[in-house]
Amino acid sequence: MFKKFLWRDCVFIIVLITTIALPAYIHTNYPQAFSRFFYPVEAWFTKRDLRCSKNAPHFLRQLLIEMIDEQKSLNNQVAFWHNGQLFHCESGWEDGFRGEKPMRVNSRFRYASVTKVLTSALVLHAINEQKLSLDSKIIELLELPAPKDPRVAAITIKMLLEHSAGFDRLKTYTPMLTMDVKPWCPTNLAQLSETKLDFDPETQFQYSNVGYCLLGAAIEKAYGRSFQSVAEDYFQLKKYGVSYVGDGFLPDEIQYDYRFEPFYAESYSKHFDFKDSLYAVGGLSGSAADIVQLLAALPKETPLTIFSHNHAPCSINILDACYGYALQPYQASRQSYTLWGKSGFFPGVNTDVFLDEQGNILATFRAASTKKTADTLLLRQYAYSLMNEYVNQK
């Protein structure tokens, strides 16, 4: 009996140690795996407290659920501008799961590449004011030396706007986002004359961060002052609560979720030059409600608007196949509704804005990296289907 008692006692101790020690070991050595395992539980709690403004369209709540379930983001904002009125919904917390600060309509996110919409709008405004033109050669405008690659001399403002200038970040690693390396744009612009392009300008579309940095430099040259100063005057950024990030995080910026981020963690922001190099590329911050209200208030200028585009043929029924001067048009097969969008990403945050030419504006902000990049395309298609249905039932 004593031996039997010892055997049972040993089994109990082993089970007890395993139950306590194994989770502690996993949590300490594999924190992402631990937090990923518990995500479904956290998602269930989060969905029990979705907060929406009065009379918010039902599809905003549907988007929040999609963002929680499929995009793996607990802490989210959705904002919608329709007929001169703002509607919004939020989920989660500013400071992490079950935190002390519920997500609010004015909680601050990084806009990431959604910033480029405003950079484009500022360039189009400068063209409308005849301070720039679509055909302005960037080498001549910036008064740079003759380039070693003669194709660089052909690059125009139009090519930079629509990502057809010859830069391919998949072939040549973007100088804007190399860890712990100061980008040559915009602080050493003469390096453009040393650059070899990845393809002949205007022969293909390839997304480019350096192209939008050069557009920021073009604005500074055209107006004779900093890009931030010109942007503040034109957009009235402070009025809308929109501000530039620096190196590190802003005091009122939300906490981001990196559990599904494959490489970067919270310290990533210290390794990139947000303050001096990324302001025109991905340097703005604010809420989803801030950006839709700012875009709704853009002056109605002519001849160019943020919906302007090159009329060269492209596959509008494929996401990311077409580029306008500010936004990317998408129209699903067998549909007549066109939605224009722009997406942004930094580690721990995904942002999207969607606009149509009827004046509807939607923004979806997620404070988390997605599990798979392809999931972000699914969200954009889902947003299109919901917007298409909502607009056409009115």
From Swiss-Prot:
SUPFAM superfamilies (UniProt xref): beta-lactamase/transpeptidase-like
What gene name is given for the protein in this entry? fimD
Q: What is the lineage of its organism?
A: Bacteria, Pseudomonadati, Pseudomonadota, Gammaproteobacteria, Cardiobacteriales
Q: Which InterPro entries is this protein grouped with?
A: Beta-lactam-related, Beta-lactam/transpept-like, Beta-lactam_class-A_AS, Diverse_Enzym_Activities
What species is given as this protein's source? Answer: Dichelobacter nodosus (Bacteroides nodosus)
Q: Per UniProt, which keywords does this protein have?
A: Fimbrium biogenesis
Q: Which Pfam families does the entry link to?
A: Beta-lactamase
Keyword Transmembrane helix, does the record have it? no
Q: In its UniProt entry, what is this protein called?
A: Probable fimbrial assembly protein FimD, serogroup H1
**Which Gene3D superfamilies is this protein grouped with?**
DD-peptidase/beta-lactamase superfamily
